[in-house]
UniProtKB/Swiss-Prot annotation:
One of its GO terms (molecular function) is pyridoxal phosphate binding. NCBIfam families: hisC. Pfam families: Aminotran_1_2. This is Histidinol-phosphate aminotransferase. The lineage of its organism: Archaea, Methanobacteriati, Methanobacteriota, Stenosarchaea group, Methanomicrobia. The keyword Transferase applies. It comes from Methanoculleus marisnigri (strain ATCC 35101 / DSM 1498 / JR1). Belongs to the class-II pyridoxal-phosphate-dependent aminotransferase family. Histidinol-phosphate aminotransferase subfamily.
Amino acid sequence: MRRLVRACYTGTGGYSYAKKADDVAREHGFDRVARLASNENPRPPSPAALEAATVALREVNRYPDERTSVLVEALRRYHGDYRFVTGSGMDGVIETVIRTVVEPGETMVVSTPTFSFYGIAAAAHGARVVNVPRREDFSVDTGAFIDACHGAKLAFLCSPNNPTGNSVPPEDVEAILEGMDGLLFLDNAYVDFADTDYRPLMRRYENLVIGRTMSKIFALAGLRVGYAFVPEWLEPFYQRAATPFALNSVSMAAAGGALADTERVRETRDHVREWRRRFLEEVPFRVYPSDANFVMIDVDPHTGDEAVARLAAKGVLVRSCTSFPGLGNHYIRVCIGEDWENIRFLEAIKNL
């Protein structure tokens, strides 16, 4: 019966997940493991988010608001008067945008190395992917990217980029928008940890979508809330393509509560920036400057897989970057965790 499965799924391994912390703890005899592999927020969600979620649980016998109106209003209070669409995590938003604009056989452009889901989702929808390698310093080759976008329906840029951590300068994004005919999806999953603000570009360009998530700085990864700034023309078509009731009532309520707690956001940002600085100063390998809640480290002469295994034996779970096309075999990605997790990592990496 395997013949019934679509070729795009039989010919690829799919999305690569980090090893489970419980498995590492059991394998190496630790009571707890430093979980630094998945770019999560180690702090619990805002009390306001938890309270709102608890209230929403009382009415889960009812279907959620398909228009996500309350969440959209909360987003406007937080960001200003933009148009928003929502989805089940950033992945859900990405997939819906692809489904909205890309026909099978049409071209999508991706700047690599980067988040692998763009290519996975493209393959699922029958799109042809053109990968544009980044420069040696992992900056975007703007000219090559624009050239690749000629005739393409959709392009993806991740800024700050996963896994390299660097941001694309707004002027480079603007040059790309000016030079391409299709739609640019700017993945801003980690932008809350950076100083760069791309939102003003939404006022000037009709071919820009900015994707965001509640999983990172807002600490709601388990509730899967994604959203995007979209131009007016795209919104009704996105809604037609979207999965019905993609966001549940509890997720939407929690997201609204988290958006209202701006002090929690500031505290989390400060925590991440302080530990990013310490990682840059104290890790005895090359650490790439990052605008995200993680850093990428070149662990040469070790491979990324070797470093992950050695750190796991010391009770630290990090991500090997060997699965990122175009990156090479000597990199790991380490997110900022709780203080004790970061301290354990620093002790472990110094004795790799």
